[in-house]
Amino acid sequence: MERSGPSEVTGSDASGPDPQLAVTMGFTGFGKKARTFDLEAMFEQTRRTAVERSRKTLEAREKEEEMNREKELRRQNEDIEPTSSRSNVVRDCSKSSSRDTSSSESEQSSDSSDDELIGPPLPPKMVGKPVNFMEEDILGPLPPPLNEEEEEAEEEEEEEEEEENPVHKIPDSHEITLKHGTKTVSALGLDPSGARLVTGGYDYDVKFWDFAGMDASFKAFRSLQPCECHQIKSLQYSNTGDMILVVSGSSQAKVIDRDGFEVMECIKGDQYIVDMANTKGHTAMLHTGSWHPKIKGEFMTCSNDATVRTWEVENPKKQKSVFKPRTMQGKKVIPTTCTYSRDGNLIAAACQNGSIQIWDRNLTVHPKFHYKQAHDSGTDTSCVTFSYDGNVLASRGGDDSLKLWDIRQFNKPLFSASGLPTMFPMTDCCFSPDDKLIVTGTSIQRGCGSGKLVFFERRTFQRVYEIDITDASVVRCLWHPKLNQIMVGTGNGLAKVYYDPNKSQRGAKLCVVKTQRKAKQAETLTQDYIITPHALPMFREPRQRSTRKQLEKDRLDPLKSHKPEPPVAGPGRGGRVGTHGGTLSSYIVKNIALDKTDDSNPREAILRHAKAAEDSPYWVSPAYSKTQPKTMFAQVESDDEEAKNEPEWKKRKI
């Protein structure tokens, strides 16, 4: 296309200015002439220029990609054939250098062309960064980039896989250890809000732990013995969290408040009444207890007197109702554990004959469900618990087994797991908050390994996870639904709390971040003394002595102590005469141990009065002068005559 010059005009302007008009106006000409432009021609020229520059840019990019491919192939060939000739290498280097120069020129031209590019830019999806094969040793074409929607879909799939795997929900990344004592922690209780933990053990102590008020020292803020010298078997907070049910080895359960003060104590029944329904309370040792999940102030206990009794806090003088477990023959059987269902309408108890019996709460006569061989007879079933949906019951038997039951078909267990040793009559089992896992602990002999916390999947009942707790038995376990933390009581006096900072809420996370408080040292102010060893004695100030030493010194001074003079022992001294008989021994010698022998002749003493008796007889002679004036004496008899006169039965037998 030809461009019109500045001198080109169209129409009537080709003939130039009118000379007649110029003469009339009085000037020689009209000056410079205005330029005219062809817009269509200019637009066409611009379009062609843009197309040419875009073509050059695309050619430069294609050349650059081709060079990169050749470099990659050459690198692969060098790796395969390292012993290539030097001439080929030089040739390749020369070619590469020439290509590099050409590529640099093309890059410069492309940069300049990009700067001079006219028209709207290409969309970002069509303009991609050149692939750098030098950075990554990738063979073949690269996969296409993912869209944002595809990435979000993949992330959602990964999250769903994690949610489907219940093991990922176990909070066991961190743990803290609470030192209860040296004996077995046989009871654990956590309030519904998860603020306070209470532990009880074989050492009769009940300790309170406050997560919000506790620091990194992990010390209990209160310790007490509510049942004196009875082992604590069960501790449980009420559904409102204001009361704690304490079940010990005695026959009377207690209810205490959050601070440990007694609220009520159940009455003890009459031991001499045969029918246990007629007694007002338990008459034998308790095993466990449980609060009603819906009704405030109602709880349940089971005992060795073969009864399960329900109580009300407002009426401690008599139980509310009595359930009496029986065998198939109608005989008494001792319940070892009991619990309420989640809605509170059912009461389940496991007995020593291996049976599990479930009653309707309002019907105390006959059980609604009865399975007589749930566990081995003669073993103590330590725990029965309902799932959160209320359809499944888990039982932890003394026969080293864990079984799962469906109460809608209570004729056989759904699943059973064996090889779980237990040596304590209160070994726990519980459900996870999402009802997908079942947890229980195992017992061991001392020095024979470590106690474990075992996790089973509810759907398949496979052992999916284990946690090594400590070198002692695992007795109690508790999985709090709000905190998502696991509490464990062990046989060596420890209570452990397992949590995950990302999955758990509050609880142990509150006290871990607090530093341990430093112990305050008592400071005393004493009088300051300036000691100058070279000062004169008269100006020296005597040092302060202890009170005890000063009293001893004053005691030795008779003037200060006003000590009376002691008696003189032995010979006199200091102007004082020793007293004779001052001691007990000298007094005895003086008064008792004297020689009082009489050397006088008794005959002479009597004959001294003989003449006076003859002259004036009064005592003997006048008495017989009238009655017997002549003196008569008894005749002497021989022993033989006396022997003859004796009776036969008195005679001596020779």
Curated annotation (Swiss-Prot):
Q: Where is the composition biased (Basic and acidic residues)?
A: 45-78, 165-175, 540-565, 644-654
N6-acetyllysine modification sites are 452
Cross-referenced InterPro entries, in alphabetical order? WD40/YVTN_repeat-like_dom_sf, WD40_repeat_dom_sf, WD40_rpt, WD_repeat_GAD-1
Q: Where is the composition biased (Low complexity)?
A: 99-111
Membrane-spanning intervals of the chain: none
A GO molecular function term, named singly, is: enzyme binding
Compositionally biased tracts (Acidic residues): 147-164
Q: Which Pfam families match?
A: WD40
Entry annotated with the keyword Cytoplasm: no
For the keyword Metal-binding, the answer is no
**Region annotation Disordered: residue ranges?**
1-26, 43-175, 540-579, 630-654
Q: Where are the WD repeats?
A: 180-219, 227-268, 281-321, 330-369, 376-415, 421-466, 469-508
- Could you tell me the keywords of this UniProt record? Acetylation, Isopeptide bond, Phosphoprotein, Repeat, Ubl conjugation, WD repeat
Q: Which domain of life is it from?
A: Eukaryota
> Which residues get modified to Phosphothreonine?
579
The record's disulfide annotation reads none
Please name the Gene3D superfamilies in this protein's record: YVTN repeat-like/Quinoprotein amine dehydrogenase
Q: Name one GO cellular component term.
A: nucleus
At which residues is the cross-link Glycyl lysine isopeptide (Lys-Gly) (interchain with G-Cter in SUMO2) found? Answer: 296, 590, 596
- PTM-bearing positions, type Phosphoserine: 621, 638
- Member of which family? Belongs to the WD repeat GAD-1 family.
The identity of this protein, by name, is WD repeat-containing protein 70
Q: Which organism is it from?
A: Homo sapiens
Q: Gene encoding this chain?
A: WDR70
